Structure formats: C-alpha cells, structure tokens
Amino acid sequence: MENNYTNNDTETLEEEMFASLEKYFQSQIEKHVINVKVLMKQRVGVAEHPDIMLTIEGELEKIASYSDKVDALELIS
C-alpha cells in the first residue's frame, strides 16, 4: 500500500501544502453553499436556528471568509 503522506518526486512539500489548503478551503465553500441551498429550499426553521435569515447570513459570511482565503493563497503561491 502506498503511503500518501510521503512527498513524490515531482511535487515539493510547499506545493503539496498549497494544494492541500486550496482543497480544504474549496471544500468548506462547497459545504456552506450546500447549507444555504438547503436552508433556502426547506424554508423551515430548525430549533437551534429560529432566525433563518440570520443563519443564512452566517453561512454567507463563512463562504466569503473561505473565498478570501483562496484569493490570499493565490497571491502568495
């Protein structure tokens, strides 16, 4: 079984770190986009989220934050 944690010959550790961070940030964006879509489609308040608009706003803030991180990562890569 191949060890996925070792550095291959064509990719430096720095490149691996940038790729990993970008994948993580993108996956977080996708997660929060799905959350917004579910909240907008369901239109039903959840017990711990009685203010649906405030909950959606919170999800949008998270999307914006991770989008900013992707942009910042591109500036330094």
Please describe what each predicted stretch is.
Residues 2-77:
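Extended, charge-rich alpha-helical interface modules
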